[in-house]
A protein has these predicted regions:
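Class I S-adenosyl-L-methionine-dependent methyltransferase catalytic core
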Residues: 1-190
């Protein structure tokens, strides 16, 4: 993924929602995601100036696959956050039937994806009624369910928020990604 080197970030966000284009380093998986979109290695992801986007009190919602869990935890630390919990578990259904979707997996056939919650400072939870499970059909490759944004809004409130690696513009959210017109510019930290 090409990233511009110059940037100026003046707005701070209380909520950062990210679905990184993870590059898999294992030979059996290489190329799967690359067939659909450009991917980034962990060092490239860690170099993004996400810490400069974060407000003093900020919640990060970060999608991770189970094979990339160590990298996701490293990324959380590199961006200046502390891991708290798994915010959401997406249980995937097939597109055209109510049956479960199963990917290839490593040892077992995979289904779920997780969205990790990490914090910087002391963001406040606005609702204790937000549930962790999301049961939703798969859509285009790697696209996450739209309802996640609504759950984040219910959990955190109507705060300044940005979606990184976005594929669509959602009202109330600033976005950054290579598949849409971005509201902000990010570049690697030097």
């Amino acid at each position: 993924m090409h990233i511009k080197r110059r940037f100026s970030i003046t707005k701070k966000y209380s909520v950062i929602y990210a679905d990184p284009p993870w590059r898999y380093e294992r030979s059996k998986v290489q190329g799967a995601a690359e067939k659909h979109y450009p991917t980034m290695g962990i060092d490239e992801l860690c170099a993004l100036p996400v810490p400069e986007l974060a407000a003093k009190d900020c919640a990060l919602f970060l999608w991770a696959t189970f094979p990339q869990l160590p990298e996701a935890l490293r990324l959380i630390r590199a961006w200046g956050f502390r891991y708290k919990t798994v915010a959401f578990v997406w249980l995937k259904r097939n597109r055209k039937s109510p049956s479960w979707f199963y990917g290839m997996g490593y040892w077992t056939r995979s289904n779920a994806e997780i969205c990790l919650l990490a914090t910087k400072g002391k963001p406040k939870r606005q609702s204790a009624g937000v549930h962790q499970f999301i049961i939703s059909p798969i859509e285009q490759h790697s696209k996450k369910p739209d309802e996640v944004r609504n759950k984040i809004l219910a959990l955190m409130g109507d705060l300044p928020r940005v979606e990184l690696f976005a594929r669509q513009k959602t009202p109330g959210w600033d976005v950054w990604g290579n598949e849409i017109a971005s509201d902000i510019t990010l570049a690697e930290r030097s």
